[in-house]
Amino acid sequence: GTVDDIDDDFEDVLGEMSPENRTITIRLLQIFEEIIEEKQTEEAEVLKIYKQIELDNVPDAIDRVNWQGSAVDVAGQIMSTLILKHALPNANHRTSISMAQWYLESLQTGFSFPEFATADYEWKEWVDEYIVESKRILTVRRNTRAFLMLSEWGCDIVKRKDDIDIELSEYNLDLSTSEAFKYYGDIHTELCTEFVKETVKRAGYDELLGIDGVEKSDFVSYLQAEE
């Protein structure tokens, strides 16, 4: 699996996208492929993973971003919408964080993210706190009605995969499915924006907290120039 292979596999889907969305989507795929290669995934597993990619979800995620905000707000939105749309079968958080990094780097301030992972490819503790809470929010967002019922039956904690506990009393569960998607989507975006802000501070680029972001067209031009 190479980037060329990916482009061939998804040629029809990519062809239906706007030029700007196509450029961003191709970069997302390149980031994803690099992550898969870093993990030295077996070839058979790689092919299986590629077949599970829901590429047509990416433009919808991109179109939900308000490109008029501050740099950290836009980066947080990019990260959040890509995670929420879950276009990739795995590595959604790593890939979405990397895309937010590309966006902040497009401001050309010299900014680069601090290291997020340890040598054995585990999240550093401060990063893991955000990732775990993100996964909790994603799970609650999809299951408010079921979790409300469990809570009424006396259940206090739900355990999801990755051994993550969800304390039901900490979340508003009395929401319809559509209300939950909007409510927890907004909370997830706030979480991702806080993550981006902490990242910028840890990297020593506090000035990024107070500057406007770049327009979508400028971001796309940056990606094209870096190809």
Describe each model-derived feature in a short phrase.
Residues 1-227:
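FIC/Doc superfamily catalytic core
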